[in-house]
Amino acid sequence: MADNEILQSTAVDAANEYDASEIQVLEGLEAVRKRPGMYIGSTSTSGLHHLVYEIVDNAIDEALAGYCSEISVTINEGNTITVVDNGRGIPVDIQAQTGKPALEVVYTVLHAGGKFGGGGYKVSGGLHGVGASVVNALSEWLVVQVHRDGKIHEMKFARGHVTEPMTIVGTTDHTGTTVTFKPDPEMFEETVYSYDILHTRMREEAFLNAGLRITIADERLASAEKPEEERRHSMCYEGGIREFVTYLNRTKTPLHDQVIYVAGQKGDSMAEIAMQYNDGYNETTLSFANNVHTPEGGMHEEGFRRALTTVLNNYGRKIKMLKDDEKVSGEDCREGLTCVISVKLTDAQFEGQTKAKLGNSEIRTLVNNIVADKLDTFLEENPQVGRMILDKALTANRAREAAKKARESIRRKTALGGAAMPDKLRDCNENNPELTELYIVEGDSAGGSATQGRDSRFQAILPLWGKMLNVEKARADKVYGNDKLQPVITALGAGIGDEFDDAKLRYHKIIIMADADVDGAHIRTLLLTFFFRFMRPLIEQGYVYSAVPPLYKLTRGKTTRVAFSDEERDAVSAELRGGNPNTKIDISRFKGLGEMNPHELWETTMDPEKRTLRRITLDDAVQADETFTILMGEKVEPRKEFIEKRAQYAVNLDY
């Protein structure tokens, strides 16, 4: 879609003029380049993509105010980004405090924007002006075009400074803003954008803003050969968060067809909740405040959870599924729940610049009241759905009680909760978890070699054996009772599920060391599924790693080398031949970790000075949840489609 198609005419409410008087200056821009992490979280790929979110958030602020219906995001050749909206256009008249055009103030002064006085925006997630100036400060160059008042105004910047003052470059009958920028390679570890990451975020924004159309396109030459559906998406969801829940549950089996939707408003604050139960055991709750994802929850989630538990307990007693002295816990009520909570409020109090948690206590009361009132009405009007939900909560309650008994049984066996460790654990001498590593090793043979080859001062070894439980298909009671997972739980010492306590964690590096074959990949996946579902903070805090053992052993005479890929094998082979193609090189493929002697295992896979570790990260919880459900869940067809689509990317697999 061409830019001028996005920049459609938009009527402006004369009673709520958006001009330079709405732009207030609070402080300067100097600190951004010195401490970028304070403003965008990090200078890794996460921070790189955050630049795009900041500009898009500003466009969505226009949508929230009722002035924008279309946004486009384009990844251009050279990994520059263009964001176009058909809002009112950033003000270009003179801002009174500075005597400069408001456009210049917005892009060069931190905390200069239309959010702070309450006139420009009643609801804002992007803090219009904060994100704009930060993106400018961290860009090698940035160009803004504003279509407003019949004219096209253009201004150019570099690393936070004006390089070309605002000029009029044409006329227009549209309104809106076009921003193009190039991330500064001096500031970022990586400057290549991921279409998939941006597409996922833009899809989320489209779900949260019913009727807003967001288009994303990848125009890089390297992407030209990809099919259209992999490099261009246009998204508009009239059903809003109801469609979001349907999307999240598409790989699961819903218990009821209808997505439950409740909404309400008090003053300038409003909340909407969409929810649907599935036959799984895991909760997926996504919460947002002014379109900003709050992964650590906050008051809106507290209000929802409190009301949900109260409503289901009261309803259960009313229909005699619960006795007067019986109750189901909040955890029981949320088993198999997929829920999206979206609140809009005038003065959102986020914890931290990255806005991970919402702190407004008044929104807890609003959400609680909406759910308490309207969910109760829904259950009364839909008794069949109500009974299905209660039945699932009761089943979860029984499983939780069974898990509690299993835990207590384990504690009794370990000297009333003492520190008795698994028999197979070969612990280290160091007690400080910040300095210790736990290698979870596939097989007793490799476990023996690892034990002999390790540095026992700080490296602990736990061998795994036999078939491991797929926790995607199991409740907590089965997990606690599983003889393959119990040693892992006990060795780590932090508990699982709602009882997980990272203060009790015994190791801050948990390294999965499995064979470089299909079986090894399966074991890694089973362990990661377990960590994701029952010990997610381990992944969120960056404690989980995958070891990278060598694939090949190359020998020439008394010289032995190893290679970690086919490419490295060929390079090492050529090096050992020394330009003589007739030199004999013995090349063997390691079939498993157990083939390596203790010295080889230490030298290649365990020595902190030489080894390669891959940290397991969680950038997108929704995508991770979906992937684990597809790969490890009950449904075969989604798994088949997933594998077929990605088969071309499979490497280093032995069949």
Give, region by region, the residue ranges found by the protein language model.
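Short conserved segment of the HATPase_c
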Residues: 90-113
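Gly-rich Lys/Arg/Thr-decorated short loops/hinges at beta-loop-alpha junctions or inter-strand turns
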Residues: 35, 179, 465-476, 480-481
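Residues immediately C-terminal
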Residues: 61-62, 89-90, 518-519
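Conserved short strand/loop->alpha-helix "switch" segment adjacent to the catalytic nucleotide/phosphoryl-transfer site
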Residues: 34-53
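GHKL-family ATPase ATP-binding module
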Residues: 1-19, 29, 53, 61-63, ...
